[in-house]
Amino acid sequence: MLRWIDQGTARGPTRPAGRAGDRSVQFNTAQRELTLKIVYYGPGLSGKTTNLRALYQRILPQLRGHLMTLDTADDRTLFFDTLPLVFTAGTLKVKLKLYTVPGQVMHNATRRIVLQGADAIAFIADSQPSKRQENYKYWLNMVENLKANGLDVDSMPNVVQWNKKDLGDASTQEAIEKMRKENRQPVYEAVAVRGEGVVETFLGLVDLTFTQIDKTYLLSQKIGLDRRAFVEEVRRCLVDPPVPGPDGKAA
């Protein structure tokens, strides 16, 4: 269980690990197809959609589907965003379906629905000191909604990304370092609007996710696809970011 650092002291709730519910991971042995659902969760305006947009820019055009978004006038996600990625790893056809959830309090029912069948979660926290309590609140909300879907945060791959790192302060860095020492979840720092830390967060979660499903489907034994090879295939789906010109814009 993640020991969430709320203003440097508070921790996440302690509760017995629940059963893992039905996830959406689909492995078609006959056609050798694997489908995974990854959800980006977190407070409103923490950078969930920004992460997906940054990934969209990095994925090879021939491998990515359409990035579907439905935003309100103030650039908040109204329902959810989805970004499909389809590629081949060894002899396996892989479909990664990336989702975000709306952050506004009023859309909790939608967040619960989007979490149905999730295989992995990236929790996007806001590094601004004023958002510390809100981060904690939404972590608890995520745990509750997972439980409502028969899922348990302790038994599924998940990472934490502290986004807007450029807007944090010394207390934020202290909280991040403390979280890294006390929790099993990998913790990443990012400035998603500049694309920094986005790919690292994504690949880190992909790594954890494959490790989890390999225990169930024994992919490394059955088709000779191990964790390193899988992550490397995902990495090959990405292109390098454009190099900034003298004016700071992409050349």
Name every feature range the model reports, one short phrase each.
Residues N108-P129:
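Inter-motif core of Ras-like GTPase G domains
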Residues K97-T100, A122-D126, V160-N163, E189:
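Conserved beta-strand segments of the P-loop GTPase G domain that flank and frequently precede/overlap
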Residues L45, Q104-V105, Q128-S130, K164-G168, ...:
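Conserved nucleotide-binding/hydrolysis micro-motifs of P-loop NTPases
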Residues D166-L218:
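Canonical P-loop GTPase G-domain recognition
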Residues M68-M106:
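Switch I (G2) and immediately adjacent beta-strands of P-loop GTPase domains
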Residues E196, D207-A251:
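C-terminal-of-GTPase-core extension/linker across diverse P-loop GTPases
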Residues D22-L70:
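Conserved G1/Walker A P-loop phosphate-binding module
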Residues S127-N183:
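Conserved C-terminal guanine-recognition region of P-loop GTPase G domains, centered on the G4
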